[in-house]
Amino acid sequence: MSDIDRDAPPPIRRLHRVTDDQLAQLSDVLIDCVDGGASVGFMHPLSASTALTFWQRVADGVHREERALFVAEDSIGIVGTVQLLLDQPENQPHRADLAKMLVHRRARRRGVGAALVRAAEAAARADGKTLLVLDAVSDGDAARLYARLGWIRVGPVPGYALMPDGAPCDTTFFYRRLDA
């Protein structure tokens, strides 16, 4: 791994089409995050087939332009990802949800998460969105990152989700105004 790989976040790009190789790499990132204890909608152990099925559905949403998918890649491959859920109800065309911000453990503490969030915010702004919302484990690294990036904490919901090991966890909702 070069000094550039260690010291700076890798470049972020938006995928408009997802290849089989990218599906496999995204699955690896998801499995690594769940193995590491991230509460991202899946229980441990997460099978490769379940992870792949999830990403195939995401790829379908990208193809239908219901989702925007961003990835961070280093010299080895995809190390992080985030999504914008663009397909909102008729009375909410101005907003999108930020979802599944995942960073492989080998790439953490390098600014990858922040770079992914900023890229998604910029794309949402360019798409005319003025409000983003998300949820995160209340006391987790992601919640601290969102607060540092200027997202407004709405508040926690006790026992909203489960950690991958089955333990209940509180979830905090955040929002970010893009027109301010």
Model regions and ranges:
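Acetyl-CoA-dependent GNAT
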Residues: 10, 14-100, 104, 117-119, ...
